[in-house]
């Protein structure tokens, strides 16, 4: 469920959406009934459209929850499959065979920094902080159940800053 929520959070963050519809949930593989268990993560609100019917509209309980889950999704996708969701060309899987894991992580971080800098309203700033924080060794230990490989180091973070 965490991976699906992360995918939803990332897709909606990229679109700049704070609210989303039931169809967005199903596109990310989230069953509404099963998701009700996670009612502390996102809430259902009702929005009346044209006065004819009520359409179910959802949002995360706080924007920072959406940004964290989006960063977690990007990080896990990259670590587990080598795909850089922030790359325009989506060729990270080819690059992963050419470079070491540390250089790839640097590439992911650089893509995130570039995207955040291109944002006119700074909507990716906290996402970037979460993404960089997920690569810290202390957090890798906490995420080991979700990660396939955890060979990251502090040197990668220093290279990103350079």
Question: Would you name each region that the model predicts?
Answer:
Residues 1-162:
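Leucine-enriched alpha-helical scaffold segments used for protein-protein interaction
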